[in-house]
Amino acid sequence: MLNTDGIVIRPATEAELPLLEELARRIWPDTYGKILTPGQIDYMIEMMYALPVVQKERAEGVAFELILDGEKPVGFLSYGPYKDEPPTMKLHKLYLDFGYHGRGIGSMALQHAIAAAKRAGCRFLRLNVNKNNAAALRAYQRNGFYQAEAVKVDIGGGYFMDDYVMEVKL
């Protein structure tokens, strides 16, 4: 059911960047609680969402956008340049409060990222998704993404990201 009334996607301001970590701490246990250990969840949130990390990525051209229900932040996404040949954008993050799943908002956010990639002249939009995140895999496939490769990335601390790399041709 598509119910995106009142949902807005807009760039996060500098002052709102700390919200990304807050949202991740709220959303990740529902998303990854049956896939990753609590220790790995904490490690990855600190590694990816600490304010200096987000500020550095933003300075490198990564866009951070909030998904709002009215004024209430309910999710976020980030995307940015990936490689020049062929021109490809990377969707780094897309997370939505569990209570907002199944309403078409994730697809709305994906289409938003696809439109940004097209505006940037990209031919592909690429992302990584945990191999065991069945709901996300289905959502990406419904939006035209296909599996390009499988990767296992050592992220330090004794943890790995065991992902599929998916992409959509634009």
What spans do the regions from the language model cover?
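Acetyl-CoA-dependent GNAT
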Residues: 2-7, 11-17, 21-100, 107-112, ...
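C-terminal "cap" of GNAT-fold acetyltransferases
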Residues: 88-89, 123-126, 130-137, 141-143, ...
